[in-house]
Structure formats: C-alpha cells, structure tokens
A protein has these predicted regions:
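Anion-binding and metal-coordination hotspots
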Residues: 1-241
C-alpha cells in the first residue's frame, strides 16, 4: 500500500497427503470458506481422482461446503467455527442461548427460560456471495416487556428474535457425531501437522514471507516454484530416516 502498510492480497490454499503437497491454488478471497470447493475440485481434476475424505480446519466449515461434500459422497472431517465452544460443558449452561431452549417442532415454537412462548413468525431466504441460498425461520417473543431477564436475553427493542436454520443445525449435529469417533479425531489431529507444516517451513526455514511478483498468475508461478522444492526436501528427509 502507498502508506507503507502490508496487507494480504492473495489467499494460498494447499492440499497435502502424507506430508507431501499434492496441489495448491491462489485465490483473491480473504476468507477460507469460499476457497474450499474450487480448491477441492481443482486438485481432484489435476490428479484425475475422486477423494473419499476431505480434512480441513474450522475456517472451512459452512452450510454450503457441507452440502457439497454430502452431494459428492466425500466424508468431510471439517469442524465449523464455533465447534470447540459448543462442545464444552459450559455451552450447555448458557441459559439465554436459544440452542439450549426447549423447541417444539410440531408447534414450531420455542420456550424461553422464563416459560414464555417464542412462536414462529416467517421464513426468510438469504443468498451469500457465491449464490448459495440459506433458509431461516424467524421466531419472536411477544412477552419480553417487563421480563426481569430481558437485559440478559436481548438488546432489541422488539423483544427476543431467533433466526433458526434447521438445515445448519442438522449439519452441525452430524459433524459432532462424526468427530466423536476416535478414528476421525486422529485424522483431524494429523491435518494440523500436514498443511500447517508447509507454511511453517516455507516461512521459517526458507525465509519466504512475501511474494516478489504481482498479479494472481505470477504469484501462482512463484508459489509453484517453491512447492516442488518443499516436496523434494520431504523426500530427502524420508530417505535419511
């Protein structure tokens, strides 16, 4: 930037298998979520194969990405952003978190901690930047006026409003069930020693901390020259053990 600040312009995505880089992509997207599907498709296309498993960290967990994995029969070992928080005992003790409230699916109604009904009001659909549609059911309590716990429950002048995405809740439940397996827990732990090592080695040992070329294509070429070297170093390390 002209003011001397350095800000990230490209998001590098790396796919690994047994500590070897098997594919990479360069994206202008600042967040990882929307790079997941195109990166996965690109790597599979280049290798001419279809993956049975896809392992990624919580930055990639989204409704759209989970749908893609399920539709393509890929077992996704992917946490979502609030996974760690939701799987702690303290989360269940959060009285005013609507996910801990009683919900009557038949009546389409929540019951708040004070026993007041929070009925269904309407359904809204939102489109994200990639064009994916998310559907929410809106619930609103009409008895918040005078409630002694209102300040703890909501800051809205209209009372407590809940946006329920039933599909997302189902997906999160599946992720929790999947990651309760020791087999998948082990695979998830392995991920951190694979992809993170690529960036750690590149920055720490090779001293590569910024690109010298400009433009997505040239940045891809520069990163592409680094990755075979990384894999070659891995091969030498294995041969010497």
């Amino acid at each position: 930037m002209l003011n001397g600040q350095l800000k990230p312009d490209y998001n590098i995505q790396v796919g690994t298998e047994n500590n070897f880089v098997i594919g990479y992509d360069v994206f202008p997207n600042p967040t990882d979520t929307r790079t997941f599907i195109p990166h996965l498709e690109n790597v599979q296309k280049r290798l001419g194969c279809k993956f049975k498993f896809a392992i990624a960290d919580a930055g990639y967990g989204s409704e759209e990405n989970y749908d893609y994995l399920e539709e393509n029969e890929i077992t996704g070992i992917v946490k979502y952003t609030t996974y760690e928080k939701e799987t702690k005992r303290t989360f269940k003790k959060k009285t005013f978190n609507s996910e801990n409230w009683k919900y009557d699916a038949e009546q389409k109604e929540y019951t708040c901690p004070c026993g007041n009904p929070v009925p269904y009001r309407k359904t809204v659909t939102k489109k994200n930047k990639s064009g994916y549609l998310q559907t929410y059911e809106v619930y609103q309590c009409e008895n918040c006026e005078g409630c002694p716990f209102r300040e703890l429950c909501t800051k809205s002048e209209y009372g407590r409003v809940i946006q329920r995405n039933g599909h997302w809740l189902e997906q999160k439940a599946k992720v929790k069930e999947l990651l309760s397996s020791e087999e998948y827990k082990t695979l998830m732990k392995k991920r951190s020693t694979e992809c993170e090592t690529v960036f750690g080695q590149t920055k720490g040992n090779l001293g590569f901390r910024r690109f010298h070329l400009r433009g997505k294509e040239k940045v891809g070429i520069e990163w592409g020259l680094l990755m075979p070297g990384y894999d070659f170093r891995q091969l030498i390390r294995l041969m010497n053990t």
